[in-house]
Amino acid sequence: MKETIQADWIKSEAFNLENCCNDNPLNILGPHFVNGQWITRVWMPEADEVNIIFKDKTYKTTTLNHKWLFEVTLPEDPKNNYQINVSRGGVSHSQQDPWAYRKEWMGELDRHLFAEGNHHHIWEKMGAHIHEETNQQGVMFCIWAPNAKSISIIGDINSWDGRHHPMQKRLGGIWELFMPIMKEGDAYKYEIRTQEGHIYEKADPYGFLHEIRPQNGSIVSKLNNFDWEDSSWITNRDSSSQINKPISVYEMHLGSWMHDSIENKYIEKNGQTRSPVPAADLKPGTRFLTYPELTEKLIPYVKERGFTHIELMPISEHPFDGSWGYQVTGWYAPTSRYGTPNEFKEFINRCHAEGIGVILDWVPGHFPKDKHGLAFFDGCHLYEHGDPRIGEHKEWGTLIFNYSRNEVRNFLVANLIYWFEEFHIDGIRVDAVASMLYRDYLRPEGEWIPNENGGNENLEAVKFLQQANHVLFQHFPGALSIAEESTTWPMVTEPTNVGGLGFNLKWNMGWMHDMLDYFEIDPWFRQFHQNSVTFSITYNYTENFMLALSHDEVVHGKSHLLHKMPGDDWKKFANTRALLTYMWTHPGKKTIFMGMEFGQRQEWNVWDDLQWELLEFEPHKGIRNLVDDLNKLYKNEPSLWKNDFDPYGFQWIDCNDTSNSVISFMRRENESNEWLVIVANFTPNFHGSYKIGVPLEGFYKEIFNSDGSKYGGSNKGNMGGKETLKYNIHNYENALEIVLPPLSVSIFKHQLKQ
């Protein structure tokens, strides 16, 4: 009777293995002590013959109740000290048995922290890890999928057949399997069978490397095998707050900054030629630059321009170029389009060596519906809300994370820490924060659900953002956390302990819209819109603002910055120079998008590259020279950055000269009264004798003039500077009588008496 029950049980287990319905393969496979004997069972689909090699002796197996379930009796506990010799179609090979390794990978504390959302290094457990288990090298796989019926590892190792390597389900919805037959570089996916019997092939949410599109599998990759050389940079960064330092950011998209001919192959250090990754069909015959090529070309370029940071549009793995990187499927992997994770680390390493920080765009607000991604991951709404009124952005065609679920928040918060810890990034910019904060964002009435208080705030998203920023600054006090938040949500840059969201910078979207609207107006009509220029100061000190002219403003028919400007070419260039100079003198940190630094004419196109040929023309060289000198001046003059978030550092001289569209103001660093005086003329009219009041008598040196010939201007100026006059104006007893060039901004610095 017992033998019949045992046979029926084995037959049932084998049936489940064959049909990918077994969540406990260790219950039947591997070594087992049965009725006083050591029985070893091996599951080997499509095998003709299987033998066990133990202590240099070969033991022939037999099949019991199923043609692919092989069994043998061994004289003692073999543990994992045996090999399987497999014959298929006359070809044989030997391998280790994955089910001989029974030790749990995720410990009790790991599971506990993950379940409560506080495992800040969960990537060290989840995913695929090259690992040595009892003197055997292999790969440990670990994935969270609590609703799955069964999960298998599929890849080249088993011809992508899910019947071969079922995983073991552990507590907390964790699945594990140690694969001694896999190694670095092997492609894989998880084949997930749902409770309803549907099968999904999923990339690894925690994968460190993924295949190049259009393929979408994950690749086993080592993580901690890079020798960093930036310890002094990191120590200095984290020793003090970065927002009290000059920050001038070059925002860019790595894949469209510059291309190369597909005929020019990239030669690796070992002499091997790397297969090129075609950029797109827009420019047939072009390819992306690799991370090493970007290291050699981009970093010197950014350093020469004088920017303090590079901001990279999302480089996490994404399947569709046209998403610009904002529809992420590989959260823990830099995209393979440009190379390997270690090559990206070397890019950052070299940035730090050249004094350049690296900011990544981070997208925790939504994710795409691609079948290999997070959507409906284990047959249920695991990462997203089940109700589309909360869990879907219909206008974007994407899904929204379920921030109320601890494990989902853990996935995201740990991902944030991962990029800082493993890749040494210096900051993040969180995209589309408003879409996270409001339940009714881009939703008509009736297509959203109020929160528990009846409001439209997404309280779970607020809690998540606060947690993410709190944990980030605990680990990395010198980090930058920048919010792209387009509404008037309060306290975005206030600490979480006083109820703020915890960012330390926020893009000033109001300033950006006002300034672009203003500069698009014919200069004659600007006198009626002076408030667009001056209004930003009224709210400037409510948040820690960053002034940004970003990629969003040079796409979708909006024109690039130069071609937003009215008038002929001369006026377009003069307006552009004036706007950029005003931006650099206005309180707030700075960000401009690639191409603006030399007057790109065409709209940005993700499938194209920048119009580098324009630098053959003097006006475009002039814009580039202007940006170079603005960055140099900015870093050398603490008055332009030290009190960005303190009203002490700014004072109007005159903001009411609407008839001339002229504004004047002062910036200062400290009690020394070493004021910088800035005067902006936003019309093409030349003023040969324009008076402004100043607080101190003496000589004011003209230290910058956007109309200089070096920048492509008319070279009208003040012959190096001006002495003050005794003249009462603007509530001051001293005045400067200055020349105001057309469409220009001039900067003067009071010279202290020796």
From Swiss-Prot:
Does the record's keyword annotation contain Nucleus? no
Q: Tell me, how does this one assemble?
A: Monomer.
Q: Which reactions is this enzyme annotated as catalysing? A: Transfers a segment of a (1->4)-alpha-D-glucan chain to a primary hydroxy group in a similar glucan chain
> Between which residues do disulfide bridges form?
none
Keyword Transferase belongs to the record: yes
Write down the EC number. 2.4.1.18
Pathway listed for it? Glycan biosynthesis; glycogen biosynthesis
Instruction: Kindly identify the residues recorded as the active site.
Output: D431, E484
Gene3D superfamilies for the chain: Glycosidases (3.20.20.80), Golgi alpha-mannosidase II (2.60.40.1180), Immunoglobulins (2.60.40.10)
User: What is the protein name given in its UniProt record?
Assistant: 1,4-alpha-glucan branching enzyme GlgB
Give the gene name: glgB
* The species this protein was found in: Prochlorococcus marinus subsp. pastoris (strain CCMP1986 / NIES-2087 / MED4)
Keywords annotated in UniProt: Carbohydrate metabolism, Glycogen biosynthesis, Glycogen metabolism, Glycosyltransferase, Transferase
> Pfam families annotated for this entry?
Alpha-amylase (PF00128), Alpha-amylase_C (PF02806), CBM_48 (PF02922), GlgB_N (PF22019)
Name the family the entry cites.
Answer: Belongs to the glycosyl hydrolase 13 family. GlgB subfamily.
Q: Which InterPro entries did the record assign?
A: A-amylase/branching_C, Branching_enzy, GlgB, GlgB_N, GlgB_N_E_set_prok, Glyco_hydro_13_cat_dom, Glyco_hydro_13_N, Glyco_hydro_b
